[in-house]
Amino acid sequence: MGECFFVNTPFPFRGIDFFPLSDYTIPDTWRKAHIIWREDGKMVYKWDVTIPKLSGDSPRRAYLWLPEDYEENPDKRYPVMYMFDGHNVFFDEDATYGKSWGMAKFLEENPKDLIIVAVECNHEGNRRLIEYSPMTYTNSEHDTIRGKGGIMLNWMVKELKPYIDETCRTLPDRNHTIIAGSSMGGLMALYGATAYNHVFQRAACLSPSLWVAPGKVLEMVARAHIRRDTTVYMDYGELEMFNHAATQESMISTAHLLLTKRVNLALRIVPGGSHCEASWEKQIPIFMECLGL
């Protein structure tokens, strides 16, 4: 029950290549990564990874947030949340449009027993759409997007997650593994929670791009074996929801199907909300609470 791959792509990778960015020495095997120090001394680690099947040897940035008491409690283990569009998660200076989710600031002000791992997307052309789609579809410019989301999730589940579990003090079981994202990343979070439900018990899907291929999204959810302890948070901003009929229809149909599968679904329309990082930032405390974090 729960072990279903909607896209069962053979996993071709043999390891993650890590590119050191500085000469800092980090405890617990995080060697030679770039440390971003916050005013109160907390840290976000940055390093580069490659995903050969998706982007060859081109590096992309990965981010790791460790809880404030991580070094003080060497026997303590933590849940892990994996996030998409890692460059938009923590810092405005790294964000595509100059505004991030502000996750570092939130966690400094609201400490959580939680490790966060976030990997940057592919910025080249329409590669983000390709890597963050579990299915093939035609976009608004009539381009065919041949989705490689299955390859991306396989990399996360079979390469990135084992590396994090080996090098950090995680709670590696399904009950303590969460996936989150927004827009196309929100679609991927839903994909993770359904097709990879044996790995991810909880998901935060903010403004998920269900509309790109609504029929295929519904098929993805319908075919998945989802355990009844699964929790999914899904929201849309008021401004994006009521201006797009396709978004409304996709949300209602997907929510109905999730409920028929007895998923613990938290569904919200955000008053005044729109499709942007500034809006998603405001939802952090809400989805964290809904997911029991």
Positions of PLM-derived features:
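Non-catalytic cap/lid and distal C-terminal segments of serine-dependent acyl enzymes
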Residues: W30-L293
